[in-house]
UniProtKB/Swiss-Prot annotation:
A Pfam short name: Aconitase
Complex formation: Heterodimer of LeuC and LeuD.
EC class name: lyase
PANTHER family: HOMOACONITASE, MITOCHONDRIAL-RELATED (PTHR43822), ISOPROPYLMALATE_CITRAMALATE ISOMERASE LARGE SUBUNIT (PTHR43822:SF22)
Organism the protein comes from: Methanoregula boonei (strain DSM 21154 / JCM 14090 / 6A8)
GO molecular function: 3-isopropylmalate dehydratase activity; 4 iron, 4 sulfur cluster binding; metal ion binding
Keywords carried by this UniProt record: 4Fe-4S, Amino-acid biosynthesis, Branched-chain amino acid biosynthesis, Iron, Iron-sulfur, Leucine biosynthesis, Lyase, Metal-binding
Reactions listed under catalytic activity: (2R,3S)-3-isopropylmalate = (2S)-2-isopropylmalate
Protein name from the UniProt record: 3-isopropylmalate dehydratase large subunit
Pathway membership: Amino-acid biosynthesis; L-leucine biosynthesis; L-leucine from 3-methyl-2-oxobutanoate: step 2/4
Source taxonomy: Archaea, Methanobacteriati, Methanobacteriota, Stenosarchaea group, Methanomicrobia
Cofactor binding annotation: Binds 1 [4Fe-4S] cluster per subunit.
NCBIfam families tied to this protein: hacA_fam, IPMI_arch, PRK00402.1
Family: Belongs to the aconitase/IPM isomerase family. LeuC type 2 subfamily.
Length: 416
């Protein structure tokens, strides 16, 4: 019996043949904390008798949720974390870098075959480069910071094989919303989802990040794409690493195999209040919106902004709609700036913000009031996620977001 890519990663790290279902103590290659989860994780580290983190170069610290500090508590948390970073010799990506998951990948802090944990549920995004990456709680993170290892129950793998060519203005976000609707919010609980097939092979890294980012929305422990030439090209200049083969064996045991063909896939919208309620945009076309948010670790990359800008063209956004554009990182912001996208969005009526989580976390800025409707390219639409529990959040692609912002209502991007 062969092995899945996840089993191979754990086998390499543990030095023995590991199979799904086994509980192992595995060394980790990276541990990420941000300004919300970091303070508690650090306190847990100290409570466990921690004095020095296992490896300062393997600890990743970022500020992205409440930046610049929007409260006295946030400011004090930032000071606390900066002090910890200085004492421990940890490089801190401060308020000017961007959203944690985007920065981790841009800076080469996750690589094929590695095990990386983060005190944030969307850490699974790093699977886009072929890493096993998963979110953990602050207590586990305190342990990881001290010992550089964690107990894992090696997950089974669901293989999602994707084929076909996307229609115009249909892409990775539409795909993952449709997969979430198919599998369900808890249909892959504590499993890894392996994205594979010809469509994935042709997909750029931005699209792969979008897919892996939302694996958690199906309850998955991780999302992962086997590294290929797209992966190794992305890693160039980010990490000095010699390409190597890493993929599931043909005779590996999978918990389930699912196949999807994107040829007939329509633009998708996840309706309130669950991510797995994705439906074709036509079923909610014409729905009134008050705010459009283009950004987040799910869809705030340069490629996403290009997608939105192509729909926008020389048109204007509906003045009755508040449009927030928030690039996922400083690097993505600069690329958009140099390409003239920022000016185009501003002239169209959007507010372009500095890289951060923004409305996605529901506690910083860009919140919606009771009765208001937000259409967002982010990853969650739970009740109260972006403000009032009496507001509504719909999820969509950057193309659908831009088209809807132009029309002032949910709109099929193929019709703009």
């Amino acid at each position: 019996m062969g092995s899945t890519i996840v089993e191979k990663i754990f086998s390499r790290k543990c030095g023995s043949d590991i199979k799904a279902g086994e509980v192992v103590m595995a060394p980790i290659d990276g541990a990420m904390i941000h300004d919300i989860t970091g303070p508690l994780a650090i306190r847990k580290f100290y409570e466990m008798g921690g004095k020095q983190v296992f490896d300062p170069k393997s600890v990743i610290m970022l500020f992205d949720h409440q930046i610049p500090a929007d409260s006295l508590e946030a400011a004090e948390n930032h000071v606390f974390m900066r002090k910890f970073a200085a004492e421990q010799g940890i490089h801190n990506y401060d308020i000017n870098e961007g959203v944690c998951h985007q920065v981790v990948l841009e800076k080469g802090r996750a690589a094929p075959g590695e095990i990386v944990v983060g005190a944030d549920s969307h850490t699974c995004m790093y699977g886009a480069v072929g890493a096993f990456a998963t979110g953990i709680g602050s207590t586990d993170m305190g342990f990881a910071l001290k010992f550089g290892a964690l107990y894992f129950k090696v997950p089974e793998t669901v293989r999602a094989e994707i084929s076909g060519k996307f229609q115009k203005r249909v892409g990775a976000k539409d795909l993952i919303l449709s997969i979430a609707a198919d599998i369900g919010a808890d249909g892959a609980t504590y499993q890894a989802i392996e994205f594979t097939g010809k469509t994935i092979s042709k997909m750029d890294m931005a699209g792969r990040m979008t897919c892996c980012n939302m694996a958690i929305e199906m309850g998955a422990k991780a999302g992962i794409v086997p590294p290929d030439k797209v992966t190794w090209e992305y890693m160039k200049g980010r990490r000095k690493i010699t390409p190597f083969a890493l993929a599931s064996d043909d005779d590996a045991k999978f918990a389930e195999k699912r196949t999807y063909n994107v040829a007939d896939l329509e633009p998708q919208v996840a309706v309130p209040h669950n991510v797995d309620q994705g439906i074709p945009v036509g079923k909610v076309e014409g729905t009134h919106i008050d705010q459009v948010f283009i950004g987040s670790c799910t869809n705030g990359r340069y490629e996403d902004l290009v997608e939105a800008a192509e729909v926008l063209g020389k048109k204007k956004f509906d003045p009755k709609v508040r449009v927030l554009v928030i690039p996922a990182s400083r690097d993505e912001y600069l690329k958009a700036l140099e390409a003239g996208l920022v000016e185009r969005f501003v002239r169209a009526g959007a507010l372009v913000e500095a890289p951060c989580c923004g409305p996605c976390m529901g506690g910083s800025f860009g919140l919606i009031a009771a009765g208001e409707v937000s259409l967002a390219t982010s990853n969650r639409n739970f009740r109260g996620r972006q403000g009032s529990t009496e507001g509504k959040v719909y999820l969509c692609s950057p193309a659908t977001a831009a088209a809807s912002a132009i029309k002032g209502e949910i709109t099929d991007p193929r019709e703009v």
